[in-house]
């Protein structure tokens, strides 16, 4: 029933948005390897861009086995911290899209090293960016200076921040309330600010 329900949901989404929208499916490390492969087979007709974190990313060998059996590309990496770990992940051909998070992988320097390792393996980055407008601006500068970017995550700046739990205040802050400038988003693209800094 689980696989059937998941497939039906994705079928409805694909029907609603059509073929001109890329579906990036976050599985949040919830499946065992065999189930991840089974789900991938069922979702192939809906042509998702990738399956993100179908299994826990702590076993790079197993992620490589899953990736080898799935025709849908795998994206992973938001919980990986060092460029050494990304190198091990990519040596096992465990993903097609690298989900490095600037906030945990060593900032700009670490992310540029990871991008270079990914490029050497013919892989693209899809930077992880769920938390704050400051991180959105940092990611925007990073992607503007990096060749092998597929797409990037862009949280809604007018919705409550996913990082509001970190303040301990209980106040729901919108991202646009935290900074003076929100990059312009138009037709699926963000404008890179001309002014210095993030």
Task: Describe the role of every protein-language-model region.
Residues 41, 47-50, 58-191:
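Shared catalytic-loop signature of beta/alpha-barrel
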Residues 190, 194-198:
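Extended hydrophobic packing segments that form well-structured cores
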């Amino acid at each position: 029933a689980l696989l059937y329900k998941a497939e039906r949901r994705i079928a409805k989404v694909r029907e609603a948005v059509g073929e001109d929208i890329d579906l990036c499916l976050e599985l949040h490390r919830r499946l065992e390897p065999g189930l991840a492969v089974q789900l991938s087979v069922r979702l192939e007709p809906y042509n998702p861009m990738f399956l993100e974190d179908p299994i826990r990313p702590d076993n790079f060998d197993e992620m490589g086995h899953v990736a080898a059996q799935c025709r849908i590309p795998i994206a992973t990496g938001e919980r990986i911290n060092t460029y050494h770990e990304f190198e091990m992940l990519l040596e096992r051909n465990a993903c097609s899209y690298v989900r490095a998070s600037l906030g945990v992988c060593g900032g700009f320097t670490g992310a540029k090293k990871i991008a270079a390792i990914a490029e050497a393996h013919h892989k693209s980055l899809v930077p992880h960016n769920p938390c704050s407008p400051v991180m959105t601006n940092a990611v925007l500068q990073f992607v503007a200076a990096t060749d092998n970017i597929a797409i990037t995550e862009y949280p809604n700046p007018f919705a409550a921040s996913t990082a509001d739990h970190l303040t301990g205040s209980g106040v729901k802050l919108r991202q646009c309330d935290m900074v003076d400038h929100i990059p312009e988003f138009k037709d699926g693209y963000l404008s890179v600010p001309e002014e210095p800094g993030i």
